[in-house]
């Protein structure tokens, strides 16, 4: 008798569908929130990173604002410890695509990688996958980068 393989659940993944135009980036943590437009982000200090994009089979250079610099004003700890490691982020693109990150994955004090909200690719504004994109160095799968980034929600695991 052959055992049946369980069916994969519908994860609601919407990859490959066209994304509606991205609006401002809204970041929330508890009752605090902030909105960032491409123009307001452009006025902040930028960091440039080079990552290998498995889909493009090439290194790509992105420039943007370090994510932790956008989270700190909302009270997200820059150097988490103890119970603060219960924090996680849900990043969402304008097409509804979502990726979950632990606070440790996006905090330079914990992780060797860098997380940026990128607004430039190869020195030019990000095209159809922008205007904003969440990019992390050290990620082996670009599917964990969020294109057309419109929301980041910081939550606490129970």
Language-model features: locations:
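N-terminal intrinsically disordered, low-complexity segments enriched in P/E/S/T
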Residues: 1-158
